[in-house]
């Protein structure tokens, strides 16, 4: 939601589509998103699965380390039928990340939304947002991120993600590889 919050602060209308558990954490997250002025009509609640929890620790060098309580998490359970297509079709830019493709159910919902956004003429924005503990394998992560790269008009990517996708430590060389491939 960081991208949405920043766009909202710049005066743009934003909306979030996703799923949280019908629990205190889910309500807290939705309230925090609403406080940023982000439309939450696309949020769905799951009575049977808890909200995914993420814990972030900052190391002395400033690097972040993530731990997750998930598997399943409510975000993984968003189905294509639950995607609010009116929000998608009204978007000028549709932003997504790879975490919405870690499981088949939410991957189908993501692909459904992207197809609708493209059909409506929206630009597609993608943030790989690689969180290694959430993937079954790094091959699966690479495959899904590669698909996301092939779909996007706008890319928000980190140095680590460039290296992960290209094998290049040099950012300029890695970026060139991404441009050439996608």
Show the residue positions of the predicted features:
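Conserved phosphate/ATP/ADP-binding segment of small-molecule kinases
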Residues: 120, 134-182
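Short beta-strand/loop segments at the ligand-binding rim of alpha/beta enzyme cores
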Residues: 121-128
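Alpha-helix C-terminal capping segments
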Residues: 2-13, 58
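Conserved N-terminal subdomain of the carbohydrate kinase-like
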Residues: 13-96
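Anion (oxyanion) recognition and catalysis
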Residues: 8, 34, 115-119, 149
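Active-site beta-loop-alpha junctions enriched in small/polar residues
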Residues: 71, 99, 129-133, 160
């Amino acid at each position: 939601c960081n991208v949405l919050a920043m766009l909202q602060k710049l005066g743009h209308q934003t909306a979030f589509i996703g799923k949280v558990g019908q629990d205190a954490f889910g309500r807290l997250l939705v309230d925090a998103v609403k406080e940023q002025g982000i439309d939450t009509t696309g949020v769905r609640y799951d009575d049977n699965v808890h909200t995914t929890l993420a814990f972030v620790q900052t190391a002395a060098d400033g690097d972040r380390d993530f731990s997750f309580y998930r598997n399943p998490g409510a975000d993984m359970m968003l189905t294509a039928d639950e995607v609010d297509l009116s929000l998608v079709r009204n978007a000028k830019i549709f932003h997504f990340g790879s975490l919405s493709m870690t499981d088949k159910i939410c991957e189908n919902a993501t692909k459904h939304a992207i197809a609708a956004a493209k059909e409506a003429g929206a630009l597609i924005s993608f943030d790989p947002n690689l969180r290694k503990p959430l993937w079954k394998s790094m091959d699966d992560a690479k495959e899904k991120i590669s698909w996301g790269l092939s779909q996007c008009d706008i890319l928000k990517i980190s140095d680590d993600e460039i290296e992960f996708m290209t094998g290049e430590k040099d950012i300029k060389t890695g970026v060139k590889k991404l441009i050439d491939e996608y």
